[in-house]
Amino acid sequence: MSTLSVTAAPAHPRQARWTFLLHRWALVVWVTLVVAISGLLLWAAGPLADDSDRAWHQLEACRRLSRCVVDTGSYAATYEFLTYALILLPFVVAAWAGATLTARELESGTALMAWTQGVSPVRWLAVRLTLPAVVLTVGASLLVALHRFAWEAPEERTGDRPTWWLPFTFHANGPTTVAACLTALAVGTLTGLLVRRTLPALGVSVAASVLLLGGAHWLMPHLRTPVTEVGPFREGYPGLYTGVELSHGLVTRTGAHIPTPECRATSMDDCLRIYEQHGGTGFYTTFHPASHYWPLQLTTTALLLVVTALLTAASFVVLRRRTG
C-alpha cells in the first residue's frame, strides 16, 4: 500500500501575496507619488534652474539701471513646494498605517480569518511590517537623493538657494526623512493594534507622529557638542545665520554668557553702552556649523531607528498578549 503525503504551501509567500492584494491601491498611490515628485525634482534641478540662471544674469547686467524687473522663474516656488511634500510624507504614512495596515483588518475580522487558516499572528504582523518598510525605504531614499540633487544646483544658477540649516531643507536633504517614514509606519501599526478602529487609529497615529518627530527635531541639536564663537561688539554675533543655532548673547568680563539685554536705541553706540553696563565685552553664538551636518543627520537617524525598533517590539508584545 502506498501512502500519499500532501505538503501545505508555505504560509509566508501566501501572506505576502494577500498583503499585496489587500493594500495594492496604497502601493499604487505611493509609487505615483514617488514618480511624480521625482519628475518634479528633476525638472527643478534642470530646466527651472537654467531659467533662474538666465534671470540672475539679466539682473546682474541691468543693475546700473534705475529700474530693473526680472522674472526669476519658478525654481524657488517649486523647490519649496517639493520640500514641504517630503516633510509631509511621514505623516501620510502614519495615517495610512494607523487606518488600514492593522486597524482595518482587526476591525473587519480579516486578521482573525487569517489566523484561523494557519497563519500565526506573529507572522501576520511581520509580513505587514516588512513589505511596507522595504517599499517606503526605497521610495523615500530616492526622493531624498533627488531633493538633494535639486538643492545642490550651483548657487550661481539659482540665486540664493535655501540654506542647509533651515529645518525643512535640513531633513529633506538627508536620511532623517527615510527614518521618519519608518517611525511613522511603526507608530501607525502599534496604534492600529491598540485602538482597533480605523478612523480613531488614523487620528491618533498622526498626532503621535507629530509629537515623536517634533521631539526628535528638538533633540537633534543636542545630540552633538556645538561650537561657541566669541567676537567683539563691532563685528556682531559671530557665526550667526551660518548654522543650526542654539543660543546667542553677551560675553561678560568674567567670561559668562548671558542673554542680550533689550535695546531700543536707534544707534549702536547707545546699545553698546547698555551692554557694557551689564558687564558685556562682546557677543557669542553657540551653533552647529556646516561640518556638523552629517553627524547631526546620522545621530538623529539612529535615534529615530531606535524608536522604530522599540515601537515594533511593542507591537509584537501587544499582539501576542491579545491573541494569547
Provide a role label for each language-model segment:
Residues 1-35, 317:
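Aromatic- and glycine-rich beta-strand/loop motifs that create alpha-glucan
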Residues 2-6, 271-277, 295-324:
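Junction motif at the cytosolic side of a transmembrane helix
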Residues 6, 35-42, 73, 80-83, ...:
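Secretory targeting signals
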Residues 23-30, 86-89, 121-148:
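Selective transmembrane-helix segments that form parts of the transport pathway or gating/packing helices
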Residues 25-62, 85-95, 204-216:
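Hydrophobic alpha-helical transmembrane segments of multi-pass membrane transport/permease proteins
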Residues 50-98, 287-303:
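Membrane-embedded or membrane-proximal helical elements that form or frame transporter/channel pores
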Residues 97-117:
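Transmembrane helix boundary and interhelical loop/hinge segments in multi-pass membrane proteins
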Residues 204-265:
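Aromatic-rich transmembrane-lumenal/periplasmic boundary elements in polytopic membrane proteins
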